[in-house]
Every structure is written in C-alpha cells, then in structure tokens.
Amino acid sequence: MSFADTLAQALAAPGRQAIPFTDHEGDATRPLVLHTYRPAQATPDSPVVLVQHGMMRNGDDYRDFWIPAADKHGLLIVAPNFDNANYPGAEVYNNGHVLAADSTVRPRAEWGYAVPERVFHWLRKAGVTRREKAYFYGHSAGGQFGHRMASTQPLDIFEAIAVGNPGWYTLPTLEKTFPEGLGGIGLGEAELLRLLAFPLLILAGEQDIETSGPSLPAQPEAVAQGPHRFARAKNYLAAGQAEAARRGVACNWTLVQVPHIGHDGDVISRVAASLWFDRTMPDDATLAGWAKGRGSAL
C-alpha cells in the first residue's frame, strides 16, 4: 500500500489518528508520526492546519489543543511529531538539522523544515485535501522551527504561518551565520526578501517573561535578543522592520501581544485559531479567564 493510500484510509473516518510517516524524499532514517484529527464535518475543501509541537515532542497534545477549533470550523489538523530518539536536541529539531556534527551544511532536502510542505503534498496526493495552501502553527520550540522554516523554505503552499513564544530567533540577516542569522547555509537576498514579504504572525504572551529556566535558551546569541521570550519577539519584529527599511521594502510581519498569557501552547493555539477563523482577537476577559491557574505548556 502506498503512503497516499495509507493516509486516505486513516483519514476516511472522523477522529484522532497516529500515522507513521517515513520521509523518503528527506532523511528516511528518521521516521515521524503524524498526529491527526478530522471532525465529522470536514471535507477535502476544509482548511488544513499543520501544527508543530514544542520541546516536549508532544504532537498528540498539540493536535488536541486544536480540536475545539477543528470542531467549530471543520478543520483538518495534522501535527508531525519529531521524537527525541530520532531528532535529538535543539540542533536536530528546532534548528532543522541544517548543520551536520562537523558544522557542514547538510543537503537541503534533508532539512527538517522541508517536512511540513511534503506532508501537505501527501495529503493532496491522497485526496484528503483539495486545498492548495495550508495553515501552519508552531509554539515554543515549534515556533523556533516555524520561523526558521519561513526563513528557509518556499512559502507558496502556506496560507498563513503563526509562531508563538519562540525561545529565540534566527535574525533576518545574511551577515550572521545560522542559526543566529541566515548566513553560511546557501541562502541569499531572494530568500530574505521572500521572508520579509510574507505576512508572518508572531504571537507573544505578555507574561512569558521568565529570565531563566531549563527551557529558555541562554546562549549569548539568544540573550542578546532580550532577557525573555516576550522581549525577544519584539526584537525580532524590529530586526525585520530594520532590514526591510534598509532595502526600501515592506516588512509584512505582525506581532500580536497576548495579555495575561505566558508560555502556554494551548492558549496561544486558541488565539491563533480565533485570529484566523473567527477573524477576531479573544477579548480581555476571555484571555484573563484562560490564564487562571495555568502554568507553562511546552
């Protein structure tokens, strides 16, 4: 059975699924699992949301964060899971395994950032979707993954990309080497202009302000971007605006500051869903209610 047939069969009925996926166009030695949810009313014309987990490698949880929105709006949710055994550490997951252990640049087809586009192409090949574009959401380490994906990959298949609370950012400059910047990995001015032109959505919890902890990147390049994730989000937008101004072009990014909310992948998922599919920001009282009694959700 081809993988297209496997997908079509698994997603023929509503509900949750966990579908093993070997990316033969990329690094076939590192399998993944696609955690999916299809509501009963979903059709091949329904929006597709690709969801990227954080450092806990919990794609099943991140899929579940999106189930209320999926049920409300008829969304197909697909959350690729990069497990710790096959994608150990930040270099192989957050940083896309762009660089080998000896710091040489790996083949571009094997970068982790190419996986979401190939997953979406398989969904189309399987007839699961007729949509030409997908939504992408990533939080925390998944937000690191997401903005680096937007920095390095063709963006034709993305309707929208939202990144929530990344720990630090790859700055939109060729003058700093990857992952601090985009230099040294075969990218050029065209890719940088493409990134600046894309309507990237940056979601930043106003209470994501811890200045130390095991999940907060603390290398000098990260600390230079600000003391905490909230400050680093604002620094990233400012860097994009400055690089665009230098070139006389627009920076089409948007930073949405989320009141009351800290490092919470569930609530930031709800905010992204509301902005995309309800076309509105949740009101202050709703956000305050969501914040009560919550800790971090990685």
Predicted regions and their residues:
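Cap/lid segment of the alpha/beta-hydrolase catalytic domain
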Residues: 83-110, 215-216
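Histidine-bearing beta->alpha loop at or near hydrolase active sites
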Residues: 258-264
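The feature captures the conserved acid-bearing segment of alpha/beta-hydrolase catalytic domains
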Residues: 159-246
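Glycine-rich nucleophile elbow surrounding the catalytic serine of serine-hydrolase chemistry
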Residues: 53, 138-148
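A domain-start/cap signature at the N-terminus of enzymes
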Residues: 1-48, 58-61, 72, 104, ...
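Short substrate-entry loop that stabilizes the transition state in hydrolases
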Residues: 42-88, 170-171, 210
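Alpha/beta-hydrolase
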Residues: 50-52, 164, 258
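Post-His helix in hydrolase/transferase enzymes
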Residues: 267-276
